[in-house]
Amino acid sequence: MQLAIAGGVATAIAVIIIVALVIRRKMGGRSVPPGLQPGQPLPAFTALDESGRELQSSDLRGRPTVILFVRGSWCPFCSKQVADLTKHYQDINKLGARLILITPKPLQTTRRVAKLFAVEFEFWLDESLAIARQLGLVLPNGVPADYRNEYGRDTYWPASIVVDGDGIIRHTWLSKFIVDRPDPAKLFEAVRSL
């Protein structure tokens, strides 16, 4: 009897997994926006750093750069991605590359997060989501209801871009279903391949 129940549960789990994979494949997730395709120049945009100083995307020329567009510290998947990247930060830095996180979080929150991770990530702020709109990375109603008073309704669709020293996009990863992020080792390999 117990064997039959265990077999039935295993079959049910297998069916659920197969159905989920089929649905995921059919949905296909989101595709990379036209302005972020590899081989194109990184579009011009303006952001603020954690000190409130205005920065331009053209400031990135001269060194390879990994840019992460993150939803916010309230997102467990973004927090895990940033925590995982701390393990590869030194390797990426040794290759002469920069690592920049662009976030819509308020400046005070960005400063707290910058101190929390205790690495030299650069945090760029896009609180109005102007960059997200320009690049096609807005996730409408992507902020959970519990956080909307502080962060608003919309946020970034998670993405990672590797740009070479000439400002050309070489690799773009767009999270397909909010929960997936590129393995930090893949970002490191992308920088190393430049």
What are these regions (language model features)?
Residues 1-44:
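N-terminal targeting signals for export/organelle localization
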Residues 42-43, 64, 157-159:
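Short loop/turn microsegments at loop-to-beta-strand junctions
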Residues 57-85:
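Short active-site neighborhood of thiol/selenol oxidoreductases, capturing the structured segment around
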Residues 58, 135, 171-173:
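Short hydrophobic alpha-helix segments
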Residues 66-67, 99, 160:
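Hydrophobic beta-strand anchors of alpha/beta hydrolase catalytic cores
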Residues 80-132:
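Structural microenvironment flanking redox-active thiols in thiol-disulfide oxidoreductases
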Residues 118-122, 139-143, 153-161:
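Structural micro-motif
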Residues 149-194:
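Thiol-/selenol-based redox modules, centered on thioredoxin-like
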